[in-house]
Amino acid sequence: LYGKYAFNNSDIHQDEIEISGHNSGFESGIIATQLLHKTALSATVSFEKAIDNNSNKFPDAQAASAINYSLSCGKLMLPKDYSSFKQTNMNAMIELLGQTLPQNGKSYFDIAPAIQFIFNSQARIDAGYRFQLLSSMNRTAPQGFLLRFEYLLFNPFENRN
């Protein structure tokens, strides 16, 4: 399970609901992942709700909620022989992503191939490109590059005596 809340001050000018960049609002969802040998499969479904962007009111004529879904597959390319969590991993990934606005039926469907590097099982760098396959909604960025860095803090409050 996951959830996030975001604030944004920009004007609202697209059908797509995206609290990680364009909308204020919240998102809650569930992620299921299965590791099969050197391949990881992951599915996500979430509910996303947009609200006013500070003084920029959400348009009454636009759908304010969305159902998001994704399916991804990642394959460990290197190292060939995995022996330790400290090894650097290189993964090839492909992700299918979509959003549907239940209030008006508009939707999009994208594909996003990427390369991922994982260092010491704690730091992650993803580089990829997202392509729009189908869409019936107005979107600001239907395609584009992705560069992401994540760093996990394992037990940051653990007493280390």
Where are the regions a protein language model picked out?
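Outer-membrane pore/translocation modules
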Residues: 1-66
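Membrane-embedded beta-strand positions of outer-membrane beta-barrel proteins
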Residues: 1-3, 43-45, 71, 92-96, ...
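Residues that define the transmembrane beta-barrel architecture of outer-membrane proteins
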Residues: 20-26, 61-69, 88, 107-111, ...
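Transmembrane beta-strands of outer-membrane beta-barrel pores
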Residues: 3-11, 36, 47-51, 75-77, ...
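Alpha-helical membrane segments in multi-pass integral membrane proteins
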Residues: 42-48, 63-76, 87-99
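Outer-membrane beta-barrel "beta-signal"
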Residues: 71-73, 142-161
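Outer-membrane beta-barrel proteins
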Residues: 10-14, 52-56, 82, 103-106, ...
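Short loop/turn motifs that connect adjacent beta-strands in outer-membrane beta-barrel proteins
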Residues: 38, 78-90, 122, 155-161
